[in-house]
C-alpha cells in the first residue's frame, strides 16, 4: 500500500492491519508523554483546500505524536489564492522533499492526481463528494471497540448520502470487513449510481432502526446544494431525524454515530447526541489513533522491522 486514496483500495487484511495497529498506538495517547520516535526526521504536509477542524487537527496531532515535522498549508493566504494550480503546488512540495501529503480538496479525484505528481505518500483526507477513507477507518475502529467486531454488523447510514464522501467510503470499507450496510435517505438525497453500490437502500428510517446494530447519522450538506432536495428542514427532521423516541426503538446494544459536524435539532437531537449510546466524542479520539496507524504504515514505520525502538508497545 503506497498511498491511501480510497477505502475501496484496501483489502480486508490491509484494513485489519490498520485497525490492529491503531489499537496498539492508542496506548500512546494514555501516556503522560504522548510521543513515539517512529517518524522522526519525516515531513508531513497537511494540504487543505477546504475548511476543516476535526480532520486537520487530528492528522496534525497524529503526525506530531509520531515525532514527524508537520507543515500546515491552507489555500487561503497562499499562492493558490493567486491562481496557482494543484499541480504546481504539488511540484513545490516535491521540490521541498515532503515525505507525506495529507490532502483535502473540493474536486473528486484530486488526491489520486496528486499521487501522480509527487514521490511521497499521499493520504486522501476528503476529495469533494467522493471519498474520505480515514473517516471510514476510524468509524470501523469505533464499531469494533464498542461492539467487539465489524463482521456481521447491520449498519444504517442515514441522511444526505448524495453529497457524502463519508457514506461512500464507509460502504466500501464496511462491506469489505463483512458488515451489512443499508443507506436510508429520501430519493433526492441518494446518488444516481447508488444501485451499483454494495449495499441495500431504504426510504423508511422507522423500518430500519430496530434491525440495526449501528446507526450513523449524516448532516445535510446545504453548502453543496444548488436547489431544494426536500420540502423543509422541519419535514426532513420529522422523517429522517434521530430523536429520543426513535432512539428508544433501537436495540439495547445499538450505538449512534456521527462523523461531524452535527446540526443538532435537524438530523440528530441534542438528547441523542449527548446520550451514552452516542460515540461522537469517541470517534474524534479514535481518529487520532487511526491516523497515527496510517502514517506509521505508509511512511515506513517499524512495523516492518521488529525490534526497532519505534515499534508500538
Swiss-Prot record:
Nucleotide-binding in keyword set: no
UniProt xrefs under Gene3D superfamilies: Aspartate/ornithine carbamoyltransferase
InterPro entries linked to this entry: Asp/Orn_carbamoyltranf_P-bd, Asp/Orn_carbamoylTrfase, Asp/Orn_carbamoylTrfase_sf, Asp_carbamoyltransf, Asp_carbamoyltransf_Asp/Orn-bd
Residues involved in carbamoyl phosphate binding: 54-55, 104, 132, 135, 260-261
Catalytic activity annotation: carbamoyl phosphate + L-aspartate = N-carbamoyl-L-aspartate + phosphate + H(+)
Keywords linked to the UniProt accession: Pyrimidine biosynthesis, Transferase
Family: Belongs to the aspartate/ornithine carbamoyltransferase superfamily. ATCase family.
Listed name of the protein: Aspartate carbamoyltransferase catalytic subunit
Species assigned in the record: Thermobifida fusca (strain YX)
Encoding gene per record: pyrB
Amino acid at each position: 500500500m503506497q498511498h491511501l486514496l480510497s477505502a475501496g483500495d484496501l483489502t480486508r487484511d490491509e484494513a485489519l492491519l490498520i485497525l490492529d495497529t491503531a489499537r496498539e498506538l492508542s496506548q500512546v495517547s494514555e501516556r503522560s508523554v504522548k510521543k513515539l520516535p517512529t517518524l522522526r526526521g519525516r515531513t508531513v504536509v497537511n494540504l487543505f483546500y477546504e475548511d476543516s477542524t476535526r480532520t486537520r487537527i487530528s492528522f496534525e496531532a497524529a503526525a506530531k505524536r509520531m515525532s514527524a515535522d508537520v507543515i500546515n498549508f491552507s489555500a487561503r493566504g497562499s499562492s493558490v489564492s493567486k491562481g496557482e494550480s494543484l499541480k504546481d503546488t504539488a511540484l513545490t512540495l516535491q521540490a521541498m522533499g515532503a515525505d507525506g501529503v495529507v490532502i483535502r480538496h473540493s474536486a473528486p479525484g484530486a488526491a489520486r492526481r496528486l499521487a501522480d505528481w509527487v514521490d511521497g505518500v499521499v493520504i486522501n483526507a476528503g476529495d469533494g463528494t467522493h471519498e474520505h477513507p480515514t473517516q471510514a477507518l476510524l468509524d470501523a475502529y469505533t464499531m469494533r471497540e464498542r461492539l467487539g467486531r465489524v463482521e456481521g454488523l447491520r449498519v444504517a447510514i442515514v441522511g444526505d448520502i448524495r453529497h457524502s464522501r463519508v457514506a461512500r467510503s464507509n460502504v466500501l470499507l464496511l462491506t469489505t470487513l463483512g458488515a451489512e450496510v443499508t443507506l436510508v435517505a429520501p430519493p433526492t438525497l441518494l446518488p444516481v449510481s447508488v444501485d451499483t453500490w454494495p449495499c441495500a437502500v431504504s426510504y423508511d428510517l422507522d423500518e430500519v432502526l430496530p434491525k440495526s446494530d449501528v446507526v450513523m447519522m449524516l448532516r445535510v450538506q446545504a453548502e453543496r446544494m444548488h436547489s431544494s432536495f426536500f420540502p423543509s428542514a422541519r419535514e426532513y427532521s420529522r422523517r429522517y431525524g434521530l430523536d429520543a423516541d426513535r432512539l428508544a426503538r433501537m436495540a439495547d446494544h445499538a450505538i449512534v454515530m456521527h462523523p461531524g459536524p452535527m446540526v443538532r435539532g435537524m438530523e440528530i437531537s441534542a438528547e441523542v447526541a449527548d446520550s451514552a449510546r452516542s460515540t461522537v466524542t469517541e470517534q474524534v479520539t479514535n481518529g487520532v489513533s487511526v491516523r497515527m496507524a496510517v502514517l506509521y504504515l505508509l511512511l515506513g514505520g517499524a512495523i516492518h522491522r521488529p525490534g526497532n525502538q519505534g515499534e508500538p508497545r
